Amino acid sequence: MVDQATLDKLEAGFKKLQDATDCKSLLKKYLNREVFDQCKSLKTALGATLLDCIQSGVENLDSGVGIYAPDAEAYTLFAPIFNPIIEDYHEGFKPTDKHPPTDFGDINTIVNVDPSGKYVVSTHVRCGRSLKGYPFNPCLTEANYKEMEDKVSAIFGTFEGELKGKYYPLTGMDKATQQQLIDDHFLFKEGDRFLQAANACRYWPTGRGIYHNDAKTFLVWVNEEDHLRIISMQKGGDLKTIFQRLVNAVNTIESKLPFSRDDRLGFLTFCPTNLGTTIRASVHIALPKLAKDKKQLEAIAAKFNLQVRGTRGEHTESEGGVYDISNKRRMGLTEYQAVKEMQDGILEMIKMEEAAP
């Protein structure tokens, strides 16, 4: 049973959302009284309540989404609120839809999107993974964090070839290492206010760390927002090489450590926006003619299911005319389709840039 103190907090949070007329989050949009009453007295086997899901969105009324899953079970137990939010964000992924099985496809059909090197500064492909048998951040114990770090760092030690590198735990990190990782844009900081409010930063920095290969083209974040964020990147537009590296790494880790996957939702993540393939394939690209009008740039990108962000990612501005453009869709398509969608859209946008007056 959910205790009275939690129920009181839930009622207060619900009222705060209802009263916030300028709040535009998906949480506010779909958490009506009926849905709230259906969910407020439920608790997952690990003890997570609706409050754990919504407290960040209640505290931060400027959230875009406003909800997180404290553990895997939350997605099914609190389906009355998660399902409509997932359907809205992932553009029509209905409660009856099923995410397709994992398929990285034929890598040979992936190309260098900018062989001339004129437009694309760098290319990144990342995915998120959760370790099977462990909840997400708010429900993890200090011992869980250490145990997970031990398991993944042992696997890092077996990496060979271009994946070979070094693991840097955040605990006890010296200033010189820290500065080097900041200069490389590899270091992640303790979570922002959205993650803090979701209780995603407990026992910091225990169990958190960064692995990168010697060439600095492959990176794993351990226990940041998700258990694992696996990132492959390099200068230029050679999407094929970058995607191949990511696939090799994911397969290597998965052969030794099972990931948390749901038949309907695909790979499970802390935030519902990353479910499914969890893949975000992006380029840092300068398209000076198309970018003269940012609204127009966004409209063109949207035609190809692509999303435009500032140079440093979400909530940032463009620096030197360089934008971060990525695939928007993560659910209801395969990993291969997600990457191919980004590739095809960028190829078209470069053609349009070249044809522009």
Swiss-Prot record:
Keywords: ATP-binding, Kinase, Nucleotide-binding, Transferase. Its EC number is 2.7.3.3. It comes from the Eukaryota. L-arginine binds at G64, V65, G66, E225, C271. GO terms for biological process: phosphocreatine biosynthetic process; phosphorylation. Residues 9-91 form the Phosphagen kinase N-terminal domain. It catalyses: L-arginine + ATP = N(omega)-phospho-L-arginine + ADP + H(+). PROSITE patterns: PHOSPHAGEN_KINASE (PS00112), PHOSPHAGEN_KINASE_C (PS51510), PHOSPHAGEN_KINASE_N (PS51509). The keyword ATP-binding applies. It is an enzyme of class 2 (transferase). One of its GO terms (cellular component) is extracellular space. Residues 119-356 form the Phosphagen kinase C-terminal domain. Pfam families: ATP-gua_Ptrans (PF00217), ATP-gua_PtransN (PF02807). InterPro entries: ATP-guanido_PTrfase, ATP-guanido_PTrfase_AS, ATP-guanido_PTrfase_cat, ATP-guanido_PTrfase_N, ATP-guanido_PTrfase_N_sf, Gln_synth/guanido_kin_cat_dom. ATP binds at residues 122-126, 185, 229, 280-284, 309-314. GO terms for molecular function: arginine kinase activity; ATP binding; creatine kinase activity. The keyword Nucleotide-binding applies. Belongs to the ATP:guanido phosphotransferase family. Catalyzes the reversible transfer of high energy ATP gamma-phosphate group to L-arginine. This is Arginine kinase. It comes from Polybetes pythagoricus.
